[in-house]
Amino acid sequence: PGSGLAALAHELAFRHIVLNDPNIGGRYSALSHFGLLPAALTGVDLTDLLGRTSTAIQSMRPAVELGAFMGDGANQGRDKLTLLLSPPLAPVGAWIEQLIAESTGKEGQGILPIDMEPALEAADYSGDRLFVYLRMDDTLDERVASLVSAGQPLLQISLDELHDLGTAFYYWEFATALAGHLMGIHPFDQPDVEAAKVLARDM
């Protein structure tokens, strides 16, 4: 609301004008108009996606467990988070990476998310790692089992199908905010990002 694009849309009588809440940070906007409108235009059944999300989040335990896993782990020196994603979910890794890095990477600390890392032997990882397995098929089960057997800290979140991504988005957003709180970090501001935008505009 109030942007030049919104003014232009009204001036030219666009067929539909969708205004998003300006208080929602971009990285937390997957379930806002910013994320849902493009999804609808590509054929995603939003009724199914949001219905499944609404049902699943009646229990926030998985999100709380994920947030505590990340926040407590970081406080204990395990501040590298390796993402293990079933192949159909691989594109989600880039969003998770941005969400966690921008939300927690400030004040001289943070969680470093690692996406698309080549597989190492379970014993080759140092003691600063956490692993989260976002599972939708069994492709990575053997690798995950070897990590667990080696004593690596790993949390698994299982999805039945792609329309459960709404649930995953919600869980990750909540968990990231909780992790930031546990680390004593404000998870919603982005001082360095805003400073960079100001510098870019002044160039």
Task: Locate each region found by the language model.
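Active-site phosphate/pyrophosphate-binding segments
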Residues: P1-V132, D137, T167, Y171-M203
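Phosphate-binding beta-loop-alpha motif at adenosine-nucleotide cofactor sites
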Residues: P87-P88, L155-H163
